Amino acid sequence: MTASPKTRKRVLSGMRPTGKLHLGNYVGALQNWVRMQDQYECFFCVVDWHALTTDYADTSRVKENSLEVAYDFLAAGLDPEKSVIFLQSHVPEHAELHLLLSMITPLGWLERVPTYKEQRENIKDKDLGTYGFLGYPVLQSADILIYKADCVPVGEDQVAHVELTREIARRFNGFYGAAKPVFPEPQTLLTPAAKLPGTDGRKMSKSYGNTIMLADPEPVIRQKLKTMVTDPARVRRTDPGNPDVCPVGDLHKIFSDKQTMAKVNEGCRSAGIGCIECKGWAADALVKLLNPMQERRRKFEENPRLAWDILEAGTQKARKAAGETMNDVRSAMGMSLAYEAPKNAESQ
């Protein structure tokens, strides 16, 4: 089968289905994905198999959480007319390629992945001494290579995973692609990382319980902002503050317009405004951003079949591209499903 020609560079990225997404997910990835749709051929997936690498003991919420992520994908602006949006587990070719790549990937490569040691140290309440957890970077590589992605948008913490994918692609091509390389070596598209604090001032993360969710209604957003930590040096209302060391100031830099940002800078530094007023302006900016998303999200919440149909249509497109790649992989390895006469067979 001849692969479909690519007119634009192809991008692949995905998110684990941990439930509803938060502002950190939006700023760190989703916002950038939406912008990329007009420039690249985009494949975006909910990587539900990856959820099993750490949460294998309880899979009861994987499907529900996957739908929640899909709602947020669509509400934020991912367009099924511009991008292929799908569930990883519905494309079995990911698993087949993962199996084949695992045969050629040295254990040492996996053990040196920075996030492997970090997560083993940080997640103490789960047994992560499993083959699946050690090998999840190979599954991640299969996710990328199955679509012959040219580029992968990632944050700095994921650069090592893309580098591993390049090494695996290079090794596969070295073994089986002498006549013609099967896989391109994907390039990293580094996502600009804005500093987005949670309500306690640390990095916004579900594990810290400090998130503002994309689906949070306005009263919840305003309440969360009211409790958000501020410049520790500003003890009294009359004390001047510094928005450059204040988590609320960081929110303003990302979400507020220039006029509001100017008022925050002048008012905070001169003690002309209090933290309550400053937090109210930040809440205004978040509500303005999230209200349209939440209106779009409600359409899918009220009729989940709409989102499911989009995922199913995306799955068909993804399987077509993945199937073409697997034909190339099997052919290169001499394991084609089609009958091929032995090379030393005599002509009849």
Task: Give the location of each predicted region.
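Non-catalytic, well-ordered alpha-helical scaffold segments
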Residues: A95-L99, Y136-L139, V162, V245-G249, ...
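Conserved nucleotide- and phosphate/pyrophosphate-binding catalytic cores
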Residues: L23, R166-Q348
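Short helix-capping/linker segments at secondary-structure and domain boundaries
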Residues: L107-E111, I146-P153, S256-V264, Q294
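Short alpha-helical patches at coil-to-helix transitions and adjacent helical residues
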Residues: Y26-A29, H94, Q158-V162, V248, ...
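N-terminal Rossmann-like or analogous alpha/beta NTP/dinucleotide-binding catalytic cores
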Residues: T2-L12, P17-A142, Q294, R298
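Internal, conserved structured core segments that host functional sites
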Residues: T115-E118, I123-F172, Y176
